């Protein structure tokens, strides 16, 4: 980013602009290099103004809580926009249908949406309590767990493009699959960018590039008590099955059809395998944990080891849920 140009624009922006921002502070793995530029918008309008001020060739990464994201130790040449400070509103949205709607901004934590829906006697969003990221990331990759998937409850989404133009889009404008969301008109398989769309580099800047600002979820009337009980059960299962006491990014790989990535990795004898300060969890083999001083390179080495081992033993190419960006 041309910082002189950014400084010229600063007077009209209300958010916080930082340079050489350590990404380890902002990703759930607590490891990795720095972003050349970071911006924390004051609200959605400020985010729009910032995007309009950016040079057209500036790579942009939008993120919330940094779940499913790893920035290599050499850092990221581009701008990271953080949504979790300001774009976190969750409120009722009356859809005029049987049930009700919940409007949630991209930076709102997914579990917050689940709890809000339950408090308002709306059912169908309970599974979001098991997704550690934000709404933006859940939309970008169709995050899911415990039998639920994000786009199964989406009524419509609000987006913004590189030029700062806002749109309202419906699910039929996207090709939605398991951990995959691609806008139909975005040729070349370009993926709408959210918190952690699972590919390994920033896309070439394009005016067709869009990010999710918010979603309205279409939910059914239900029993708040039953929803809260279901959320409690889900969280108990998560605590029992996953290494939540150590920094991690959730599931590293998608589950292959008819199988589980964790089973395949464990069958390769990799459970508990360490590289530097990182380790394939001895509690859940599809998790890689930071034991306290891991570098991004340590984590990536274990990802590559798991991919190579499963390919050699089973002939299965594991697909990543996590996104790795930046330079080694």
Q: What would you call each of these model-derived segments?
A:
Residues 2-135, 145:
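Anion-binding (especially nucleotide phosphate/pyrophosphate-binding) glycine-rich loop
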Residues 17-19, 25, 31, 69, ...:
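Phosphate/pyrophosphate- and phosphate-bearing ligand-binding catalytic cores of soluble enzymes
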Residues 38, 101-103, 156-158, 214-216:
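Beta-strand secondary-structure signal
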Residues 122-127, 132-171:
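Glycine/threonine-rich beta-strand-loop-alpha-helix active-site module
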Residues 69, 114-117, 125-129, 142-149, ...:
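A generic local secondary-structure boundary/capping motif
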Residues 40-41, 70-73, 81-82, 116, ...:
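Short beta-strand-to-turn element immediately C-terminal to the catalytic PLP-Schiff-base lysine
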